[in-house]
Swiss-Prot record:
Assigned keywords, A-Z: Amino-acid biosynthesis, Arginine biosynthesis, Cytoplasm, Transferase
Organism: Sulfurovum sp. (strain NBC37-1)
PROSITE patterns according to UniProt: CARBAMOYLTRANSFERASE (PS00097)
UniProt protein name: Ornithine carbamoyltransferase
Chain positions recorded as L-ornithine binding sites: N159, D223, S227, M228
Presence of the UniProt keyword Cytoplasm in the record: yes
GO biological process terms on file: arginine biosynthetic process via ornithine; citrulline biosynthetic process; L-arginine biosynthetic process
Pathway: Amino-acid biosynthesis; L-arginine biosynthesis; L-arginine from L-ornithine and carbamoyl phosphate: step 1/3
Length: 306
């Protein structure tokens, strides 16, 4: 049985198999062909962090695959009242066919998976957001930016950055990361990614100059400067990230046909300008839709590898 906790757990071929499934299922969906790959299966969806895209995409996705989604907030189950994660896992995994968890600590997700009898999917943790990176790569393919791309991540060294590191390392493309001093990536995750990159041939570089990172890139991406749970740091962060807003001046340094990706929600006037966001809106909202299709590919792949 396999879980989907971080991209680190898969080889290149397996990740591309999931992407291929996502492409196939998306094409079928567009033709109104809803193939019941997961007929009568139940997806338990545990949310300790709220979300728009994660809930809608997983709940819609499992339904389109012939199953049903069961939404469980921390307040709906005993987990929110102190039941140990391992006990919650041993109960829920006896009643459903797959579990998606959106939570804070990666360790909680891993504990749940360790005791689960069914596949577990990382819907987001403070350390990683792997379903989003599968989504982003699917979007890159659709917009012709997946053939030996040069990608730049500009902003906070957070769960999105960590997942970009793993995707680049596994697939072997070039990634440039620019973060303000003091907001760099987790050094342990960086070490893991760099070790993997030695085998794949990926070129991963780090710096504190966003303009230098973006030069000649095919793909530019960023994320919010203030993630959930960091609201008390907002003013300090806004000052630290001055000069990191992706605007037309910054995008002009990338290739003329470069695309801009954002996992949403976007805060215009902070990490991205209104003009740049709207100029790349078709890509961004295709990316948002692709959460649905990428996650269906992941769920079907996991079911096939139980």
């Amino acid at each position: 049985m396999r879980h989907f906790l971080t991209l680190k757990d898969f080889n290149k071929e397996e990740l591309l198999e999931m992407i291929a499934l996502a492409q196939k299922i998306k094409a079928q969906t567009k033709q109104k062909q809803f193939v019941p790959y997961l007929e009568r299966q139940t997806l338990g969806m545990i949310f300790e962090k709220s979300s728009t895209r994660t809930r809608v995409s997983f709940e819609t996705g499992i339904y389109q695959l012939g199953g049903i989604g069961l939404f469980l907030s921390a307040n709906d189950i005993q987990l929110g009242r102190g039941e140990p994660m391992k006990d919650t896992s041993r109960v829920i995994s006896r009643m459903v066919d797959m579990v998606m968890i959106r939570t804070f600590e990666q360790s909680k997700l891993e504990e749940f998976a360790a005791y689960s009898k069914v596949p577990v999917i990382n819907g987001l943790t403070d350390s990683y957001h792997p379903v989003q990176l599968m989504t982003d790569y699917l979007t890159m393919i659709e917009f012709g930016k997946a053939d030996d791309p040069i990608c730049a991540y500009v902003g906070d060294g957070n769960n999105m950055t960590h997942s970009w590191l793993m995707l680049a390392a596994k697939l072997g493309f070039e990634l440039r990361v620019a973060t303000p001093k003091g907001y760099e990536c987790d050094p342990d995750i960086v070490a893991d990614a760099m070790e993997i990159a030695k085998e794949s041939g990926a070129k991963i570089t780090f710096g504190n100059d966003p303009k230098e990172a973006v030069k000649g890139c095919d793909v530019v991406t960023t994320d919010t400067w203030v993630s959930m749970g960091q609201e008390d740091e907002k003013e300090i962060r806004l000052k630290a990230f001055e000069g990191y807003m992706v605007d037309e001046a910054m995008m002009s340094l990338a290739k003329s046909d470069a695309i801009f990706l954002h996992c949403l929600p976007a805060y215009r006037g902070y990490e991205v300008s209104e003009e740049t966001f709207e100029k790349h809106a078709e890509v961004i909202f295709t990316e948002a839709e692709n959460r649905l299709h990428a996650q269906k590919g992941i769920m079907v792949w996991l079911d096939q590898h139980c």
